[in-house]
Amino acid sequence: MTAQPPLHHRHHPYTLFGTSCHLSWYGLLEASVPIVQCLFLDLGGGRAEPRLHTFVVRGDRLPPAEVRAVHRASYAALASAVTTDADERRRGLEQRSAVLARVLLEGSALIRVLARTFTPVQIQTDASGVEILEAAPALGVETTALSNALSLFHVAKLVVIGSYPEVHEPRVVTHAAERVSEEYGTHAHKKLRRGYYAYDLAMSFRVGTHKYVLERDDEAVLARLFEVREVCFLRTCLRLVTPVGFVAVAVTDEQCCLLLQSAWTHLYDVLFRGFAGQPPLRDYLGPDLFETGAARSFFFPGFPPVPVYAVHGLHTLMRETALDAAAEVLSWCGLPDIVGSAGKLEVEPCALSLGVPEDEWQVFGTEAGGGAVRLNATAFRERPAGGDRRWLLPPLPRDDGDGENNVVEVSSSTGGAHPPSDDATFTVHVRDATLHRVLIVDLVERVLAKCVRARDFNPYVRYSHRLHTYAVCEKFIENLRFRSRRAFWQIQSLLGYISEHVTSACASAGLLWVLSRGHREFYVYDGYSGHGPVSAEVCVRTVVDCYWRKLFGGDDPGPTCRVQESAPGVLLVWGDERLVGPFNFFYGNGGAGGSPLHGVVGGFAAGHCGGACCAGCVVTHRHSSGGGGSGVGDADHASGGGLDAAAGSGHNGGSDRVSPSTPPAALGGCCCAAGGDWLSAVGHVLGRLPALLRERVSVSELEAVYREILFRFVARRNDVDFWLLRFQPGENEVRPHAGVIDCAPFHGVWAEQGQIIVQSRDTALAADIGYGVYVDKAFAMLTACVEVWARELLSSSTASTTTCSSSSVLSSALPSVTSSSSGTATVSPPSCSSSSATWLEERDEWVRSLAVDAQHAAKRVASEGLRFFRLNA
């Protein structure tokens, strides 16, 4: 096969089929005409191998006001100005972003086509191969051509290290310095306002199997990374830079923003040193330029001429592929998220011919994001955060028919990425039955394909590595809300239409649905009808297929439905954001671009079935910092079967369920061996509660359950990944740290004083981590579930006390839990010879003692656990 000659050696216009990978602002030339660079991937058309080119595109002439906005000041100058207030600085950043984004997305008719990155286009260049003259969406391109071409390219993995000056507080506080201290929301912005900088930089690029290390001005190394070409355009000399073999640059989410910006500034100086023509724009917008931080997203409008983004951790970075990069960029729906709403594309929805009138499906549209959680509120109960909670009985659940009017939507704007505050809300569901997680696998992807044209979102790229198609689609839909309201509302309405009919059908068929997430994930119990048992999976599949055909018609079957896993019926919503329960899965590395989608976490083996079931309930349980296991107690009064004794004596605390001396490695399905974080350990233990509480338990048996959590914590006490949490910028008190880290969602651990310690995955665990804070919160979750179980047992057993004819004789002095044929747990009353009043008194005493015993057990085990952590710190 004859190699294709370079474009700049040709003397006639040439047509190329390929895709735009990135648009960047080069500069303003004569008559205020903006020039945009386009990194273009030529697919080769079967004549040659795919190849990267850099072209220029003319934009429409800018008005004088926008020209002044571009030339006035850089992002850094606008963000660090001490003569303006915070609102004025923010408006300055937004105004500059709006001008740059308008040119990069809508600067001309050609730019509007090329701004749809990683979608097939056809272009025509001038004879010199410099300027794109025409561009249009490509028709008839093989669906796998783009994926095959991208598989031949790489992502450059960039790691930058350096040194920082010591930060000294000023002895004399000036008025400006006082304003900085009052206004900053993160350590990062405070440092920026005080002139923080980095020096002694060293950077490493890994492209495929090759690694390039730059510590000085090594032009030979740069020549292997970037191809430089000087061209003359509109009587101006330009230097076009094209990456060699890679289509994007990725960094870890722990990369310091200041080091990253400094690295690209250094490379810019080397590549354009001694250049007499006009260099491209050099600017940077990142989360460190905002007072309260922002998403971990980077916008380099001019140089480098490739997209730059962050992934979660060094291990993920080393496995990043060009297909992952394409998925990441596609999910932006325009420019990186840090640019804001001005950086998103306008996407027109498809005109649909549906079998349902508009007013029937449009009513289900909501502003909630794709990861929003919808709870079945028929059994919601709220309890006050303060007061004597042990004896406060909640009101009975509301009963409004099928319960479809009793739904609470939980916002998920952060994706559950960060832990709530100490005074968070626990929303608890407990039921002694097998709960199924039913997944509509490809619902979101197929609805998006129906509503958005392929030229706006390419559905044919194979997302099979870091990012799943669902994660890309979900973030793309989220970004439609800013400038494509009609498309966003259409998609959300159709998804809500199907989701709401699934839960309505479950309720009508006698199935208890507990929670739905993102329109595609449902937590449902099997049920019974007059004809026999009803399968949750079959019910959901039938409803989805029925309403899919009703909407779109034809013989095309609906999206695929399956039971992803099953576990005992325990779910806890923490702070309206994170789900904790006995489910053994995580949401991938997360989603595009942002933080991981921390969804349901837990560690229970799928398929475990509880037996008889107690009336299910979702109860709001408020947790204050002093509740649950306090983490502080008198060591002399700790349990004799405590952690230290269990380590060597084999004392079992009187429990034949879980011996307190059982080492963590011997615990069935232990998350210590399977991985997962501390919430996984808690979720695993929560899954054992329904089976444990079917009959009366002693204090020592309750202590054994709390001690199981403690054992798991002790076994992973030095494991960094086990304790890491993801925190949002500006929402917590963060300890001072080197670099610029806390300006975006960052990983950290709790300290005993309630502060947040910035913690890297690749360094040793902080010596002063607050183990007691984790123990306190974990024990509070367990105690909340026990209390909910006790009160639901009390509520569900009321009906069984009205008659003696259906009662059974107790085998012990106190009532025990038995299974009823209706699938709910009841407390068997004493025989007719016993006094009903006496039995009620015994029952109430037992139920109240269960909650009190759980609180006492939590305090005793927390006391011995804290003693161990102090001695072994």
Curated annotation (Swiss-Prot):
Coiled coil, from the record: none
Pfam families noted in UniProt: Herpes_HEPA
Chain positions covered by the region annotation Disordered: 394-422
Localization (cell): Host nucleus
InterPro entries recorded: HSV_HEPA
Sequence intervals crossing the membrane: none
GO cellular component: host cell nucleus
GO biological process entries: DNA replication; viral genome replication
Major place of residence: host cell
Domain of life: Viruses
Keywords: DNA replication, Host nucleus
Biological function: Component of the helicase/primase complex. Unwinds the DNA at the replication forks and generates single-stranded DNA for both leading and lagging strand synthesis. The primase synthesizes short RNA primers on the lagging strand that the polymerase presumably elongates using dNTPs. The primase-associated factor has no known catalytic activity in the complex and may serve to facilitate the formation of the replisome by directly interacting with the origin-binding protein and the polymerase.
Family, as annotated: Belongs to the herpesviridae HEPA family.
Self-association state and partner proteins as the record states: Associates with the primase and the helicase to form the helicase-primase complex. Interacts with the origin-binding protein. Interacts with the polymerase catalytic subunit.
Protein name: DNA helicase/primase complex-associated protein
Organism listed in the record: Human cytomegalovirus (strain Merlin)
Lineage, top ranks: Viruses, Duplodnaviria, Heunggongvirae, Peploviricota, Herviviricetes
